Swiss-Prot record:
The gene is Abcd3. Disruption phenotype: Animals show normal activity and have no obvious malformations. However, necroscopy show increased liver size compared to controls, and fibroblasts show reduced numbers of enlarged peroxisomes. They show however a defect in bile acid biosynthesis and they have impaired beta-oxidation of the branched-chain pristanic and phytanic fatty acids on a phytol-loaded diet. This is ATP-binding cassette sub-family D member 3. The chain crosses the membrane at residues 84-104, 126-146, 224-244, 313-333. It comes from Mus musculus (Mouse). GO terms for cellular component: mitochondrial inner membrane; mitochondrion; peroxisomal matrix; peroxisomal membrane; peroxisome. SMART domains: AAA.
C-alpha cells in the first residue's frame, strides 16, 4: 500500500480524474447521439430509406467480408499493376524500417563520439549519415509515390466497375425512379469512392509499417534486454487496442451519416442550379435559401457532434496509445539498467551503458510508437467501415437492379380507393414481353406506376406499322406511364406486351436532351462518329436531315459539324425540338413516341415533319393537344384519368378535341 501511495500525488489524481470525467462525457455523448438518431426520424430528402435495413458500420466479420469483396474488384489478378504497387510499397516499408534502425544506431554512435570527445568517430559517423541521406530520401519519396499511385489505381478500378453496373441498360433510371434504397448516388460514385480508396491505402501503410517495426525491434530488443520487455509491450497493445476499439464503434455510423448529409447538401445546391430559371420566375430565392440553410444546418450540427467525439477520442487515444505506451516503454527498458545485479551490465563502463541505453531506449521508444500507431489505426479502420458499408450497399442495389429486383414501398390499392383493385398485390415483372417487328400490342396489361398505383386496370389495343396513333387525355391520366412501360423503363405487372426491340423504338420528349459534344453529336446521339460511318451515313445526308426540319442554316452559323458548344444554351426551344426530330430521321426507327415534341414549332414546319415521317416509314405515337395533327393519325387513344380508356379509328365522324 505504501508503494502504491507514492503515486497518489495531486498531479496524478488530477490527470486520472480528468480522464475519468472525459470517459463519462464520451459515454453520455454516445447515448445522446443514439437517442437523437431515434427521435429525429428520417432525413427529409432521404425519407424513402427503410430504418430496418441500415447498413452496419463496425469492425467485425461482416466488415472484413465486405472489404474482401471490394478488394477483389480493385486487385482483380495476382499479376497486375495494383499488385506491383503493393509490392513496391511493401519493399519501401521494409527499407524504411531498416533505415530507421540504422539511423538509431548511427545517431547513437555520433552522440557517443561527441560525449567521448572522439573527433575521428564523430566525423566518420557523421559522414556516413550525410552519404546515406539521398538513399533515405529516395526511399521515403518512393513510398509516397507508390501510395499515391495505388490510391489512383484503386479509384480507377472501383469507379469503372461501379459505372459499368450503373450505366448498364436503364439501371441509372431505375435507381432514381423504381428503387428507394439509395439516395444521392452521385455522392457515392464520386466522393465516397475516392475517400474509400484513400482510406484503404492509408490503412495498408499505417498497419504494415508499425508491424514491420514491431517485428524488427522485438528481434533487436530481445537480444539486448530479453524477451520480457517486448512481451510486456505486446500485452499492453492487446488490452489497450480492445478498449479503444470498443470506444470507437460510433465512428463508422457517424461517417455514414456525414456522407448522407453531405449528399443532401450537394443535392439541394444542384437543384437550385438545374431549376434556376423556374425559381427566378417564381421569385423563390428566399424559400430556396431557407431550404439550403436548413439542410446545411443539419450537416453542421452533425459535424459539431463528430468533431467533439473525435476530440474526446483523440484525448483518450493520446493518453493510452502514446503517453502511457511511452511510460510502459521506460519501465521496461529501465529494468536491466536499474537492477545492479543484472549480468548484462556488471562490467560495463559508463560510456558502454550510455550507448546501450540510447540504442535500447530509442528502439523501445520506436516500438512503443509503432504499437501506438497500430492502436490508432483502429480509428481509421472504424471510419473505413463506414465507407465500406456505403459502397457495399451501392454494389448490392446495382446488382439487384440489373437482375430486375428492386425495393420500393408499395401503395395499397385499397388506400387509393380504386374500384376493382386486385385482391393480390401487383408483382413487378409478372407480365410477358414479346419482341416482334412492325407491331405494338397491349394484351390485358395493367397500367400501373412502380409503387403500385393502378392507372388503367386492363389495357388492350393493337397497332401495326403505318397506322399512327394520337394519344390524348388530362394530365396524370397515364400517357407518359404508357410510354415508360413501352420503353421498358417501368416493370410490366401483368398481361402480354408485343413490340419491337428497344433499338427500333425511339422517344422524342418535349424538352429534348442535348449531349455534351459537337453539332454532329446532337444529330446522331446516342451514336458516335464511328457508328455514323458504320451506318454509311455521310455528313451530306445529315445536312439533309437538318434541312428537313428547317435547321440547315445552323451548320454555318455554329461553325460546322465539329463545333463544340453548350447546346442546351445555344439552341432555342424550337431549335432543340427540331434538332430532336432530325435525330429521329437519322435513326429511322419502326415506331416513334412523340411527347408534345413540336409544341414550340410552327404549324407549317410541324406539318412537314409529320408528312416526312410517314414518307420514310416511321409509325408515330403522338401526345398532343393540337387539332392540326389529327389528319396525320389513323387511331386515337383517349384516357379519362379515372381508369377508363377508348381506342378507336379516326373517321370523318370523329369529334376532334384540342386547341
Amino acid at each position: 500500500m505504501a508503494a502504491f501511495s507514492k503515486y497518489l500525488t495531486a498531479r496524478n489524481t488530477s490527470l486520472a480524474g480528468a480522464a475519468f470525467l472525459l470517459l463519462c462525457l464520451l459515454h453520455k455523448r454516445r447515448r445522446a447521439l443514439g437517442l437523437h438518431g431515434k427521435k429525429s426520424g428520417k432525413p427529409p430528402l432521404q425519407n424513402n430509406e427503410k430504418e430496418g435495413k441500415k447498413e452496419r458500420a463496425v469492425v467485425d466479420k461482416v466488415f472484413l467480408s465486405r472489404l474482401s469483396q471490394i478488394l477483389k474488384i480493385m486487385v482483380p489478378r495476382t499479376f497486375c499493376k495494383e499488385t506491383g504497387y503493393l509490392l513496391l510499397i511493401a519493399v519501401m516499408l521494409v527499407s524504411r524500417t531498416y533505415c530507421d534502425v540504422w539511423m538509431i544506431q548511427n545517431g547513437t554512435l555520433i552522440e557517443s563520439g561527441i560525449i567521448g570527445r572522439s573527433s575521428k568517430d564523430f566525423k566518420r559517423y557523421l559522414f556516413n549519415f550525410i552519404a546515406a541521406m539521398p538513399l533515405i530520401s529516395l526511399v521515403n519519396n518512393f513510398l509516397k509515390y507508390g501510395l499515391n499511385e495505388l490510391k489512383l489505381c484503386f479509384r480507377v478500378r472501383l469507379t469503372r466497375y461501379l459505372y459499368e453496373e450503373y450505366l448498364q441498360a436503364f439501371t441509372y433510371y431505375k435507381m432514381g425512379n423504381l428503387d428507394n434504397r439509395i439516395a444521392n448516388p452521385d455522392q457515392l460514385l464520386t466522393q465516397d469512392v475516392e475517400k474509400f480508396c484513400n482510406s484503404v491505402v492509408d490503412l495498408y501503410s499505417n498497419l504494415s509499417k508499425p508491424f514491420l517495426d514491431i517485428v524488427l525491434y522485438i528481434f533487436k530488443l530481445t537480444s539486448a534486454i530479453g524477451a520480457q520487455g517486448p512481451a510486456s509491450m505486446m500485452a499492453y497493445l492487446l488490452v489497450s487496442g480492445l478498449f479503444l476499439t470498443r470506444l470507437r464503434r460510433p465512428i463508422g455510423k457517424m461517417t455514414i451519416m456525414e456522407q448522407k448529409y453531405e449528399g443532401e447538401y450537394r443535392y439541394v445546391n444542384s437543384r437550385l442550379i438545374t431549376n434556376s430559371e423556374e425559381i427566378a420566375f417564381y421569385n423563390g430565392n428566399k424559400r430556396e435559401k431557407q431550404t439550403i440553410h436548413s439542410v446545411f444546418r443539419k450537416l453542421v450540427e452533425h459535424l459539431h457532434n463528430f468533431i467533439f467525439f473525435r476530440f474526446s477520442m483523440g484525448f483518450i487515444d493520446s493518453i493510452i496509445a502514446k503517453y502511457v505506451a511511452t511510460v510502459v516503454g521506460y519501465l521496461v527498458v529501465s529494468r536491466p539498467f536499474l537492477d545492479l545485479a543484472h549480468p548484462r551490465h556488471l562490467h560495463s563502463t559508463h560510456s558502454e551503458l550510455l550507448e546501450d541505453y540510447y540504442q535500447s531506449g530509442r528502439m523501445l521508444l520506436r516500438m512503443s510508437q509503432a504499437l501506438g500507431r497500430i492502436v490508432l489505426a483502429g480509428r481509421e479502420m472504424t471510419r473505413l467501415a463506414g465507407f465500406t458499408a456505403r459502397i457495399t450497399e451501392l454494389m448490392q442495389v446495382l446488382k439487384d437492379l440489373n437482375h430486375g429486383r428492386y425495393e420500393r414501398t408499395m401503395v395499397s390499392q385499397q388506400e387509393k380507393g380504386i374500384e376493382g383493385a386486385q385482391a393480390s398485390p401487383l408483382v413487378p415483372g409478372a407480365g410477358e414481353i414479346i419482341n416482334t417487328d412492325n407491331i405494338i400490342k397491349f394484351d390485358h396489361v395493367p397500367l400501373a406506376t412502380p409503387n403500385g398505383d393502378i392507372l388503367i386496370q386492363d389495357l388492350s389495343f393493337e397497332v401495326r406499322s403505318g397506322a399512327n396513333v394520337l394519344i390524348c387525355g388530362p394530365n396524370g391520366c397515364g400517357k407518359s406511364s404508357l410510354f415508360r412501360v413501352l420503353g421498358e423503363l417501368w416493370p410490366l405487372f401483368g398481361g402480354r406486351l408485343t413490340k419491337p426491340e428497344r433499338g427500333k423504338l425511339f422517344y422524342v420528349p418535349q424538352r429534348p436532351y442535348m449531349t455534351l459534344g459537337t453539332l454532329r453529336d446532337q444529330v446522331i446521339y446516342p451514336d458516335g462518329k464511328e457508328d455514323q460511318k458504320k451506318r454509311g451515313i455521310s455528313d451530306q445526308v445529315l445536312k439533309e436531315y437538318l434541312d428537313n426540319v428547317q435547321l440547315g442554316h445552323i451548320l454555318e452559323r455554329e461553325g460546322g459539324w465539329d463545333s463544340v458548344q453548350d447546346w442546351m444554351d445555344v439552341l432555342s426551344g424550337g431549335e432543340k425540338q427540331r434538332m430532336a426530330m432530325a435525330r429521329l430521321f437519322y435513326h429511322k426507327p419502326q415506331f416513334a413516341i412523340l411527347d408534345e415534341c413540336t409544341s414550340a414549332v410552327s404549324v407549317d414546319v410541324e406539318d412537314y415533319i409529320y408528312s416526312h415521317c410517314r414518307k420514310v416509314g416511321i409509325t408515330l405515337f403522338t401526345v398532343s393537344h393540337r387539332k392540326s395533327l389529327w389528319k396525320h393519325h389513323e387511331y386515337y387513344l383517349h384516357m379519362d384519368g379515372r381508369g377508363n380508356y377508348e381506342f378507336k379509328k379516326i373517321t370523318e365522324d370523329t369529334v376532334e378535341f384540342g386547341s
